[in-house]
Design a protein with these regions (language model features):
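Non-catalytic terminal/accessory segments
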Residues: 1-175
């Protein structure tokens, strides 16, 4: 990725890059190589979506770098596989042990962008997947409220890592 102020500068840099690549006997993939005006459109690169929106006091748009939709779908699919019903023989502790390395790696890679909103979404998704597994094991409705109480307590002390709450203690109110 090469960042330039004007389209003319970008085209000059692109031509210079082509010359360097031909000297090295390498080629650029025309489908993946393009010049983009970030004020008008966004683009994905290495799992991040680069986009400008919002405004400063001067009226300029701010650049943002967040996990792409494809990356979000991929991590949700991985979470879904770990927490699926087919692995019902596993306890929640085993699921947490499998989820923690996934969460830690994903968080460490994407923490350098503007990922707060996406991290919160993923924390809610993990909670919902684990809660759903516990909730639907109880068929009788009168027990479900008690199960929720116990699950909140368990989740708060389970040792599961969070996407958003990095190196922070998270307090969960138990009702």
């Amino acid at each position: 990725m090469i960042v330039c102020r004007t389209r003319k500068d970008a085209e000059l840099a692109f031509e210079h890059l082509k010359r360097i690549m031909t000297k090295l006997k390498l080629t650029l993939n025309p489908q993946k190589t393009k010049i983009v005006d970030m004020n008008k459109e966004s683009f994905d690169f290495l799992g991040f979506r680069y986009q400008k929106f919002g405004k400063t006091k001067c009226g300029r748009k701010l650049p943002y770098m967040m996990p792409s939709k494809k990356a979000m779908k991929k991590v949700k699919d991985a979470i879904r596989v770990i927490t699926c019903r087919k692995s019902a023989y596993e306890g929640l502790e085993q699921k947490v042990e499998k989820l923690n390395p996934l969460i830690r790696g994903w968080r460490n890679y994407f923490q350098h962008g503007n990922s707060t909103r996406r991290f919160k979404q993923l924390d809610e998704y993990v909670w919902m997947r684990l809660w759903r597994r516990v909730y639907y094991r109880r068929k009788q409705k009168k027990y479900r409220e008690h199960v929720l109480y116990g699950f909140r307590k368990w989740y708060a002390t389970s040792g599961i890592e969070y996407f958003y709450y990095l190196n922070k203690k998270r307090y969960v109110a138990v009702f």
